[in-house]
């Protein structure tokens, strides 16, 4: 059994670690709130863009953008969004499990897959377990611009436009609340019909007016669809950042609480040993006094 000096050293070491985890918990909580604000600010933009595109799509039944045309699937692409740093609980592991489940469905059909990765943890995962990574970006920070993450996204979209890929998914952790993050695999292109669903189409049939398009409706659809796809990916990145910080906050709180429990257990052992040592010393003194007398 450890002596009193060793137990005191362990308690001191755990207390130092507890201070670190508590500080990390507080930092993660602050970053989560800011990330959540940025995430919520972006949602109205994507929703407004979707409504405008829906109007254009239903106003022009003759033109179909490649992003809206389904074709037989021989190869799929995944834009995988992970964190750059660890200490975030099971956030990335759960995401990789959801991704693997989706990939398995296509592997059973002999469909090949390739990956564009955003985040250092994703790069490490594919280095360890394999997978064709066509492009990657890391160190995007807590407040990335779209230019920072654009390269792998654009490379994947170019492959889709050129017919090298027949379907693209975006994989990320959806922020539900501070305690819950949901691993999500959403089809990006071709855009599912639900993206411009019955609500918008119903509205269009009721309207007797239309826009005046400059230079023409095809050019507008091409431009706006590209920006809409970009907004979806960027929003997914912001959701993942908020999820990362909330998961790290919860993980660090659990670590802080566990450290407290461990300190209490060690303190109890320390007190018992100290009491036993005092009792032993008293017994020795009493025994010595009795022998002298």
Curated annotation (Swiss-Prot):
Keywords carried by this UniProt record: ATP synthesis, Cell inner membrane, Cell membrane, CF(1), Hydrogen ion transport, Ion transport, Membrane, Transport
Topology relative to the membrane: Peripheral membrane protein
Localization (cell): Cell inner membrane
GO molecular function: ATP binding; proton-transporting ATP synthase activity, rotational mechanism
Alphabetical list of InterPro entries matching this protein: ATP_synth_F1_ATPase_gsu, ATP_synth_F1_gsu, ATP_synth_F1_gsu_CS
Subunit architecture: F-type ATPases have 2 components, CF(1) - the catalytic core - and CF(0) - the membrane proton channel. CF(1) has five subunits: alpha(3), beta(3), gamma(1), delta(1), epsilon(1). CF(0) has three main subunits: a, b and c.
Cited NCBIfam families: ATPsyn_F1gamma, PRK05621.1-1
Name this protein carries in UniProt: ATP synthase gamma chain
Provenance organism: Psychrobacter cryohalolentis (strain ATCC BAA-1226 / DSM 17306 / VKM B-2378 / K5)
Encoding gene (name): atpG
């Amino acid at each position: 059994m450890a002596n009193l000096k060793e137990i005191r050293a362990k308690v001191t070491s755990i207390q130092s670690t507890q201070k670190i985890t508590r500080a990390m918990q507080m930092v993660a909580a602050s970053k989560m709130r800011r990330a959540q604000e940025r995430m919520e600010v972006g949602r109205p933009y994507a929703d407004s863009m979707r409504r405008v595109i829906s109007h254009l799509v239903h106003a022009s039944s003759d033109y179909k953008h490649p992003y809206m045309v389904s074709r037989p699937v021989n190869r799929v692409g995944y834009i995988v969004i992970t964190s750059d740093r660890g200490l975030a609980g099971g956030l990335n592991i759960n995401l990789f499990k959801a991704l693997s489940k989706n990939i398995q469905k296509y592997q059973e059909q002999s469909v090949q897959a390739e990956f564009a990765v955003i985040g250092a943890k994703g790069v490490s995962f594919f280095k360890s377990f394999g997978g064709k990574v066509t492009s990657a970006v890391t160190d995007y920070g807590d407040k990335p611009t779209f230019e920072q993450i654009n390269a792998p996204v654009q490379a994947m979209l170019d492959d889709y436009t050129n017919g090298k890929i027949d379907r693209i998914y975006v994989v990320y952790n959806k922020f539900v609340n501070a305690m819950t993050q949901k691993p999500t695999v959403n089809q990006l292109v071709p855009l599912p019909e639900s993206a411009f669903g019955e609500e918008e189409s119903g509205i269009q049939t009721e309207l007797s007016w239309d826009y005046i398009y400059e230079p023409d409706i095809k050019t507008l659809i091409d431009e706006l669809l590209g920006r809409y796809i970009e907004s979806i990916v960027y929003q997914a990145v912001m959701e993942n950042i908020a999820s990362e910080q909330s998961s790290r906050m919860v993980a660090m709180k659990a670590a802080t609480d566990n450290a407290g429990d461990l300190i209490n257990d060690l303190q109890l052992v320390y007190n018992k040993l100290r009491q036993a040592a005092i009792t032993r010393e008293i017994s020795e003194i009493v025994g010595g006094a009795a022998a002298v007398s």
